[in-house]
Each structure stands twice: as C-alpha cells, then as structure tokens.
Regions:
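Bacterial N-terminal signal peptides that target proteins for export
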Residues: 1-9
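Central antiparallel beta-sheet cores of small beta-barrel/beta-sandwich binding domains
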Residues: 21-126
C-alpha cells in the first residue's frame, strides 16, 4: 500500500512539471543568416527577452551589439517584426515563428531589409 502511495505521488510530481510553462516562445538566443538577393550571407545572433508582455532584445549581443528599437508580435499569426538601427542602415526583420512547441527546433523565418539591401533570413533557437 505504501509503495502505491509513493508511486502516485511521484507520478503527480512529474505531471506538474509537464504543465509548467516555459515562457514566451520568442524569448531566447537565436542564430541564423541574413541572405541577400545577391551576395553572401551574414551570420547574425539575436537575443530576445520578454517582460511584462513586451519583447526587447539586441542584435549580435556583446561589445558591439545593437539594441532593438522595436519588437512586435501578432499572436494570431505568430508574425514577428524586429527593428534595429544598424550601422549599415535600419534593419527590419519580418517573419513567422514556427515549431513553437519545440525546445530546440523553434524557427523564425522571413524577409528583411537593411539599408538598401533586401533578402531572406532563417533563425533557429539555440
């Protein structure tokens, strides 16, 4: 009888962790490439934070990182737009978040402009 009680308590403990939320699906460290219509791709890292319902972050975080000026998310379509003032010109990333249930395979895919440059991008959560 005692063993059954312990088994039930352990199962309840595991089920509680399954119900726990992991946070905002856009939050985290993302890496990927900006691929212009002509020319070679540039590797980029994004660091996104979520606090009080707002998204903030930086592009290529670190010593030479650039703070995002605006991040918007349309939760109905999971379309996210990121704006950042890069030295090459204003960066605007517009794309969709996908694989939201995955811890390791979430993607952010779309198109971008940076100054006069236009192209596609694909980021994956790290």
């Amino acid at each position: 009888m005692f063993a059954r009680l312990i088994t039930v308590l352990v199962c309840l403990g595991f089920s509680a962790t399954l119900l726990a939320q992991t946070g905002h699906p856009a939050k985290g460290s993302w890496s990927g490439d900006l691929t212009p219509a002509s020319g070679s791709a540039s590797h980029v890292r994004l660091l996104l934070n979520a606090k009080n319902g707002e998204l903030t972050g930086s592009v290529n975080p670190g010593k030479n990182g650039v703070e995002m000026s605006k991040v918007t998310l349309d939760a109905a379509t999971w379309t996210m737009t990121i704006n950042a003032p890069m030295k090459e010109g204003a960066l605007v990333l517009t794309g969709k978040l996908s694989n939201l249930g995955s811890w390791t395979n979430r993607k952010y895919i779309g198109t971008y402009t940076m100054g006069n440059q236009k192209g596609k991008f694909e980021f994956i959560i790290n």
